[in-house]
Amino acid sequence: MMQQTFDLRLATLAANYRNGNTTPRALLAAIRQRAEALNPEFNLFIHLLSEAEQAPFLAALEGHSPETLPLYGVPFAIKDNIDLAEIVTTAACPAFAYRPTQSATIVAQLIALGAVPVGKTNLDQFATGLNGTRSPYGRCRNAYHPAYPSGGSSAGSALAVALGVASFALGTDTAGSGRVPAGLNNLVGLKATKGVISTAGVVPACRTLDCVTFFSATADEASQLLALVARSDQQDSYSRRNPQWNSRQAFGRPSAGFRFGVPQTLNFLGCRASEALF
């Protein structure tokens, strides 16, 4: 299982591209090979893009660099309830599958910024579930303890980042789907305010609550990604302009003291096994 691993942090990738240590084409080919080796055990991808399917995205990078495209050559994964043009969307239900003619707004934004899709990731069917086990495409396994669940519903997206085949991944969150698998796989799961990231082109679970989320290795990278894509979108009736307080420029230590609470006891509803795992 231990294939070649890569440092896919945004700053490191940009430096490696500038220094000529690798190219987007070479990196994506190596990542595809690693993903193919991992998928039989972890079931993280429903569809891995082939070399031919990735070719247009790589061709669009010609003449560019990290200086002209902030996500130049950055590999990312897409939960398979979010549209990528001409690649089948299943929402983990083969009978529902369709081939979209255009990408979801968020996917189109990221591609325009230079990011390259790796594949469509596995999920609890129709994004309904928090385990990562309710999919006809196989049960997703935890990146650190394969006998444990990955969490869901954005299971494959979390695994793509945790297993080193994507710098970041897109998920969705209606009731925890973008945060639970992040927590179970040692990642940051960013669910922004409803409407800050467009959900146009997303198969709905609950339209009034659905949010597109980011999985990333660090909070700083999640913040960078949010700052790049937070835009209002006329195709999304729930879209809103990004307020200044949601910008990474507004982050920092509070001038006054900050108080937070930690419960003295945790209630696991009588489940001793869960208490022991915690």
Which residue ranges define each predicted feature?
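A structural signal for the main folded, soluble domain(s) of proteins
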Residues: 131-134, 149, 171-174, 184-185, ...
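A short helix-breaking turn/cap at a secondary-structure junction
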Residues: 191-276
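Gly/Ser-rich catalytic/binding loops embedded in alpha/beta enzyme cores
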Residues: 2-174
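Conserved active-site and cofactor/substrate-binding residues in soluble primary-metabolism enzymes
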Residues: 8, 22, 26, 101, ...
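Short beta-strand-to-turn element immediately C-terminal to the catalytic PLP-Schiff-base lysine
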Residues: 48, 161-162, 189-191, 215-217
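Short glycine-biased active-site loop of nucleotidyltransferases that positions the nucleotide triphosphate
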Residues: 69, 179-182, 250-255
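Flexible loop/turn segments at secondary-structure boundaries
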Residues: 125, 176-179, 211, 268-270
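Glycine/threonine-rich beta-strand-loop-alpha-helix active-site module
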Residues: 132, 174-200
